[in-house]
Amino acid sequence: MENFPTEYFLNTSVRLLEYIRYRDSNYTREERIENLHYAYNKAAHHFAQPRQQKMLKVDPKRLQASLQTIVGMVVYSWAKVSKECMADLSIHYTYTLVLDDSSDDPHPAMLNYFDDLQAGREQAHPWWALVNEHFPNVLRHFGPFCSLNLIRSTMDFFEGCWIEQYNFGGFPGSDDYPQFLRRMNGLGHCVGASLWPKDLFDERKHFLEITSAVAQMENWMVWVNDLMSFYKEFDDERDQISLVKNFVTCHEITLDEALEKLTQETLHSSKQMVAVFSDKDPQVMDTIECFMHGYVTWHLCDARYRLHEIYEKVKDQDTEDAKKFCKFFEQAANVGAVAPSEWAYPQVAQLANVRAKDDVKEAHKPILSSIELVE
């Protein structure tokens, strides 16, 4: 890729992985595949329902790709929660990815949002109608404080996606805008709060740790994502409203300076994450560490981020950063490179077609009279 700062990216990635002491040992291969298939299967059946198919209006290939990406993220990162919780979170976060990739103007469907919310009516916006229907399945896993974070952060995410519809990177001199938008659409509080299901953590007992984790995760999670996404977004016309690009516009700096700004903030956040929780409740630290390592594995292994292209490009180079990056990449691939054919079946489109055929058969069944039923 022309002009992509490969050497800088390698150095940054290596420092990040060293800071978090990357060593993903969350699962055996069998456990990983089992959890992937369980979460995928439940989520696929959810999105194959006629109501979801009709209201989402998403290209089947895009929906399939989105679901596989999100199931991977949840299973790899939320390694401590139950399989049922993984499945319900996979559905919720797939909805968010579908919205993130949407180009529909939300304004008309949001005119009566609060009135409908207050009156308990179904939302006019189809995304909100479906997300609200599924929310009880998600919230049943969490206490009230964590649940509030999930609800509020999801609302922020919707607003962030609304802003992004305008492809507005901020005005020059508006230094607060890039981080404002990234926090809005980053789902950091939703992610940070969903690590603590009530079957594993009493949120009253661990309230201080959970609150601190939500605060720290807000930046760490989105900054790592921005860093690991930088390659795939570098020349993608659809991804020009990124944090790095918005730094360039608002801070009036070069792309290299913007990338360095993101790098320093990500590395500082990584140091903080480890330092703050290293002497806290071991179960809390273990949960955070498993999330960080799994989250990195997911980025390195998921085809969406195309980091295998970087690996192929530099695997024969003799620089220290290239060798370290390749070692980390191979380490991630050894545990996380699982072909979708091993777990992502059946396809959502296949399930939807089966449901549609069943509905047609049901509609053509003869209607029995009351006399025939008695006989």
Curated annotation (Swiss-Prot):
Q: Which GO terms label this protein's molecular function in UniProt?
A: trichodiene synthase activity
Record-listed E.C. numbers: 4.2.3.6
Reactions mediated catalytically:
(2E,6E)-farnesyl diphosphate = trichodiene + diphosphate
Which keywords does the record carry? Lyase
The entry assigns this protein to a family as follows: Belongs to the trichodiene synthase family.
**Free-text function comment from the UniProt entry:** TS is a member of the terpene cyclase group of enzymes. It catalyzes the isomerization and cyclization of farnesyl pyro-phosphate to form trichodiene, the first cyclic intermediate in the biosynthetic pathway for trichothecenes. It serves to branch trichothecene biosynthesis from the isoprenoid pathway.
Q: What other facts are recorded?
A: Trichothecenes are sesquiterpenoid toxins that act by inhibiting protein biosynthesis.
Name of this chain's protein = Trichodiene synthase
- Species of provenance: Fusarium acaciae-mearnsii
Q: What is the lineage of its organism?
A: Eukaryota, Fungi, Dikarya, Ascomycota, Pezizomycotina
- State the encoding gene: TRI5
